[in-house]
Amino acid sequence: VEAQANATVYDGGVFIASCDKSMPAMLMSIGRLKDMSAIVVTGGVMEAHTLPKKYVVNDPACAINDLLTLEQIGKIDAWEKTSVIPNEQQDYYKLKACPSCGACAFLGTASTLQIMAEALGLMLPGTALMPATAPELKQAAYDAGVQVMKLVAEGIKAKDIVTMKSFENAIMVHAAISGSTNATMHLPAIAHEFGFEIDADTFDRMHRGAHYLLNIRPSGDWPAQYFYYAGGVPRVMEENKSMLHLDVMPVTGKTLGENLEALKKNGFYEREDIIHSFDNAKGTDGSIAILKGNLAPEGSVIKHTACPKNMFHATLRAKPFDSEEECISAVLNKQVQPGDAIFIRYDGPRGSGMPEMFYTGAALCADPKLASR
């Protein structure tokens, strides 16, 4: 992207991305191209699949409700290895877990970074996490093209939009949505390209006392496709505006405060099923914390909103493994018991590049005895 833009001497561009790696990469590219006008358009978020009643699993330890989303497939994969459910049922889940195009339908890295792009001011208001199949997405893309030409005409560059205040706003929105812990790596990298420095401790400091509002999986009940219809990023910012810099300028060319006021007047958001109000927050201490101690002297990150309260203080037996594959095998072979604390070594950013530990958690959830503890 950067090479193409520099080779053709663009005055402005519309940047399209959706997923875990492409969205932060696109935002980093904009940081390097900050002397041109830029708007980001999402490729959209995937739909959830509505399960027929016979495929709903009501076991509280390993529930699969009537809205199937991709993050549940790891659990189903572990069930397959232990023959918990019939093959025909497993095949059905796998076939239907991605029923449409778009980013995964839960608040993982992809959804979080789409929201961060809008919180930084680089998307048109309300367009992050639009459903990939929604007809409004085509209109949003067209509007972005029109707006970027206005930015070019007015001489408004990416560097005029993305400031240190923008990053502080994004971190406050991250707290409100219980965003992915991977943002603690991606946002500092994006900030660096724009000429600013933030670190994990910045997240920890700003999350303290922040209100957590979003009822979206994995820290809530609903698939990510409903976020847009509930008011999206503007609704989160409106509820949280007492903690934001309202004088920043997004790609609309107006201040954030002016944008929120305009949306509030037109009735863009109403109910609280998906996005809670500031006064009725799901929590009031942000959504992640940076933990330091003898296990991680330089720091580690936890999304405490997705962690059972009884695990905040616990005495457990250490069960270390040298790879995720070893760990999954031990879980499936009943070598991990309630009261064990799993440690997987050599899979951090300096080891194997910090891959997702997705299937380990899924294997634990697939064992009712472990999932209920």
Regions found by a protein language model. Give the residues of each.
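Catalytic or ion-coupling anion/metal-binding cores of large enzyme and transporter domains
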Residues: M23, S29-D35, G43-A371
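N-terminal cofactor/phosphate-binding cores enriched in small/glycine residues
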Residues: V1
